[in-house]
Amino acid sequence: MTIQTLFKPDGPLASHIDGFKARAPQLEMAEAVARAIKSGGRLLVEAGTGTGKTYAYLVPALESGKRVVISTGSKNLQEQLFYRDLPTITGALSYTPPVALLKGRSNYLCIERMNRLLSESHLQKPEILNDLVKVKSWSIATDNGDVGDIPGLQENAEILAHVTSTNDNCLGRDCPYYDDCHLVVARRRAMDAQVVVINHHLFFADMAVKDTGFGELVPQAQVYVFDEAHQLPEIATNYFGKSVGSRTIQDLAQDIQLAYRAEAHDMAQLGKAADRLAIASQDLRLAFGVDGGRGNTRDMLRQPLWGQALARLNDAIGLCYEVLKLALGRGEQLDHAFERISELRTRLGEVLAVNQTGFSYWYDCSRLHFTLNLTPLSVAERFSAEVQRPEVAWVFTSATLTVDMRFDHFKAELGLAGSAELILDSPFDYGEQARLCVPRYLPEPNAFGRGEQLANLMIPLINKTPGGCFFLCTSHQVMRQVAEVLRREIGRTVLLQGEDNKQRLLKEFVENGRAVLVATSSFWEGIDVRGAALSCVIIDKLPFASPDDPLLKARVDDCKLKGGDPFAELQLPKAVIALKQGVGRLIRDRTDHGVLVICDPRMVNKPYGATFIKSLPAIPRTRELGTLGSFFDRTERCE
């Protein structure tokens, strides 16, 4: 059956799916995907919000009968595809291939680590014990081991790190529970499936494993579809680099202690070596200073106190290595700990070998933890080699792939020159549904107290807004300033990112209907609030990355060395993509109405402002905040 027939008004999709009506851009995308699948090669599709891109790639992918891997940028979309969209489409096509959902290892219960924690329960904190009871009770009945399903457990609960595994602490085939391992079972299902739904992190983890020559995590396929593909460059960069973090070090120190008690309690030096490792990790964190932050590792290596703390950590790692070497053969936990300390020693040397070219060496330090990172400046060559497989189709789609209607930036980041391209506008009527305002008399982007000034400037608009409002900020400092003023001055519920987890904040926002949510980057994308609950999106300034970001600095320097223009080639495109994501929160349906306010004068008084405007949907623009109230009045009358 042809794609056109499947999408016809009297076709199988319309007959099976209530309210389904094919849109012209959706059909155009589906036909392009079908051609790519038939001929192989690469296809880039920017599909505006409301295009219906999920069905546009699912239908031809399933109709092809080939093995398909679909990768998403978020677990939410991954689950939506598997539990909602795939059953709908397979039902409409009367075709039920074996399908599988596969997540990364941190999503699955590790039976061995849970049982080890139970055996050491007398050593645990009360809050860990309370959650351990929930985990154990749930583990008896679960059929997939997905820890996201544990009832009554916070999504960031401390216990999750203790009952899931990492690449470092997994015992692999030496584990006594290997045959019952939830992760192993999930991977087996995926290997037997025709359609596998994964996420981008898992795709790149699989590439990293294949590079080592030790098997694979994701089955080979004939068709790969990447939804939310704009996230790929950043995720790829993280996976093709290396890192050493204090969490990993302290987790290893704890596991050495447990192995000492369980398998070699006569070797007191094991316990002492583990203590020394944990203390050395904590000392290195303190050497970063109270504020922490991000920076260049080369700069830290020049500081004597930091160098001394690093030397103590190296000594502690060396001691653990020698003591564990003496304990080899006394137990599986000890043998595995020796493998991990060997890997840690090697990796620490790699992230500190700061004289290699083509990499950024940087650290990220929070209140309690640090990470030392080695990150490649470009992943284009490595990724391009991956997508050259003959007779394999690669489809990349998102609402935000282009800058000024061109794919150049995305193609350069991933080495996708020569790909077929398709840009599809949103079917929404932005002329009727939305207004864009860049107000006059704005404070400068780096003005002192800017958050307070913006909040006071926006109060009349927020009060006039019939529904809810997102106030999206580019820094936590401005976010807190805005929230403080709004809570003092307006009679609405003001929700603040960080005061509760993301899902509960969104739930309260939607249920309230007139709340203001003040947030930063994590709410710029992947949020779908339809109807009047979100009628206004305010963006504090253009989302340029901080010039102090060590990875950006390294890329800027590299671009200059090659004779390029780092602002035009790096900073501007990334800011445009980020702004398009933030703007995309506003209109999610044909019946939505709302206003978008961008509080940055550079949109109109800098030459590059035109690039931002041309990259956004064709929303009628104004500079007068006061006119937005009449837009709301008109839309309310129409309703």
What are these regions (language model features)?
Residues 2-16, 66-194, 257, 289-295, ...:
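A substrate-engagement module of RecA-like helicase motors
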Residues 34-35, 54-67, 84-88:
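Walker A/P-loop NTP-binding motif
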Residues 68-76, 396-397, 467-474, 597-599:
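Conserved RecA-like ASCE P-loop NTPase motor core of nucleic-acid helicases/translocases
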Residues 2-45, 59:
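Conserved pre-motif I regulatory segment
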Residues 474-498:
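Conserved helicase motor "Helicase C" RecA-like lobe of SF1/SF2 P-loop NTPases
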Residues 439-449, 499-604:
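Conserved RecA-like P-loop NTPase helicase motor core
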Residues 160-196, 207-214, 319-442, 449-456, ...:
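A contiguous, basic/glycine-rich beta-loop/short-helix subdomain that forms a polymer-engagement track
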Residues 63, 79, 84-87, 167-168, ...:
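Signature of the SF2 helicase/ATPase Hel1-core->accessory helical subdomain module
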